[in-house]
């Protein structure tokens, strides 16, 4: 007969009918009892021939691929012009005085951030945009390309111009200015001969207004040649030939599209974004577009006498000028030929765009190192898209990078720190990752991009192949024409207009700010925000500021005080260049919602949406059916988050952990499901630890236990010898049960850790409930007053130690610590508290 739920509760000592704890609790460590209970509850994981269940509620397991949903109406989020103040340490010191060593070290880590992978694998451009949505390939291509363009315009990406130069938008940093090669320009007044000197260096420097000007007589690193003669049309801005002092008319920079022969003498060749694979590196691709240089003052400056009518120049263009514009001169192949689309506009705009600033970069191949694709911004916002960057090559294989570890505040640390009767609000940092600048030397390792529409479509279509590798073009221009492509492009034309042409060209971009797809980024963001919050805490010692990643919370004793603090802190953060989203500032009152918890003066509980997820999970959980271990992983992830708020905690989930480790199916018996259900439907807050003086001590030997409760000494023996850790845990349980003390001294590190998952299952569950809310203090064995009673010597009295317990915030980064805020609530349960049931010894 299977074990009933009520009988199981009695075995676990969760009911009041249990006998004396000193007799009942040691039985739970018995191997035979644990084995019999596991058999009765079907926890032994026998090999079952019944087919596994691969879906439970929202959890899917093996062999069930979730089809991602593409939204053709995704909006690309707008990104502010984020420019973190370069001299951020001095700005902070002006605000708060000298910074600590820890704060300086962390701020220096991100100004600029550096990235040193062991090795970098370069992938072909076709893998730049992942075919994540097979039914919406073209739409996804343009949406992703638009997202990348938006990031570049906002100054978060570099655009690779040539092998050794890149352009970007936004304000430059000093480490980027240092990479400029040659003299600076000073607006439109010096756009004549000196402008071409700059182009001859292959850098195309364009600094902002007011930047320092080097003397035009000063020698650049290129030597005097580049400043003594104007740039001829045949001279190419290729860094390799410039260093050699030779300008070859036959060698052109890879990825450059020079204009046709009619303009060859008028325009200096400039890098464009027509980037193909290495097989075509030496091929020249004529550029059709009219170049307009925008000076730092914002005026368009046309070079020499170039016609501004792109239509006129396009008609005399060679055959390989631009894949998109070739359709203009070709005969339509069908009703769905792209010629119809291209002829809708006279002026499709330039083939490529260039940033405001051009810098030298380390040698960067025409490849990508990671793929990108779009997903919903979050489960609650499906109208906007989010760019997912896959740089997983740096986290896999023999050359994987060991990312630095950093402290994640655990539940008890968070509760100790934030559980008070303060009034709270949380700040929303806009695009937090894109605040932290990367050194340009990291660009060759963090490359994203696309191969251009023609190659992308050809790669994904079954009847089109890229045969002419020499020119990287299709053997027949109209091979790519199809009804699906035509319809998709016509619909996209309404959204993107003439940008369809720009986005159809190849492009390679490197990250200028830290990307989200690299394990280094969370570490850097955590260091940065923790240092900033430390500065805020020192500036406002009567308040509390805390952050985890981009989640920043402020606490003050009154709402009026909090609003004043909010204004001051916001102004300080804005002065550093940190962008906040005021529309997403949330005022929480006295119950803070943070990291999935609700934290108030009574302690912490999971947020309501997590509780609802757990209820939904139990409603869908089948009994007596083997469930795929992959599904169990999802269930354990959800239940594990709320485990500290239950009676038996993590030990109750150990059968599921075991099944996942052995990659076996797990079958829920009705009793085990009812047990877990009861556990998770009654959640108890995790309370804030309070400082105190330890008056109760416990110790044990394999054969006996001893307690020291004030001046009282107790001892007892076990029926059979037990492992020492098990004996020490039993002694701690007896001390808690007999004294009711929430502070116990012990010399056992396993008991101190409060992790009871390695003990016999029944004992771990019962001990977790008995010791819930108990704090432990380490006492050396030689000084432990309970040491003698545990060895059977009651007559010897060692003096009680004055051991003070101070609640800790763990390894959480708190350099400037706010004074603790005493709770004004009495120790008894407040009428508004969700804590309805106080702990009773079993």
UniProtKB/Swiss-Prot annotation:
Gene3D superfamilies: 3.30.70.270. Disulfide bonds: none annotated. One of its GO terms (biological process) is symbiont-mediated suppression of host innate immune response. Activated by host HSP70 and HSP40 in vitro to be able to bind the epsilon loop of the pgRNA. Because deletion of the RNase H region renders the protein partly chaperone-independent, the chaperones may be needed indirectly to relieve occlusion of the RNA-binding site by this domain. Inhibited by several reverse-transcriptase inhibitors: Lamivudine, Adefovir and Entecavir. Residues 178-345 are annotated as: Spacer. Multifunctional enzyme that converts the viral RNA genome into dsDNA in viral cytoplasmic capsids. This enzyme displays a DNA polymerase activity that can copy either DNA or RNA templates, and a ribonuclease H (RNase H) activity that cleaves the RNA strand of RNA-DNA heteroduplexes in a partially processive 3'- to 5'-endonucleasic mode. Neo-synthesized pregenomic RNA (pgRNA) are encapsidated together with the P protein, and reverse-transcribed inside the nucleocapsid. This is Protein P. The gene is P.
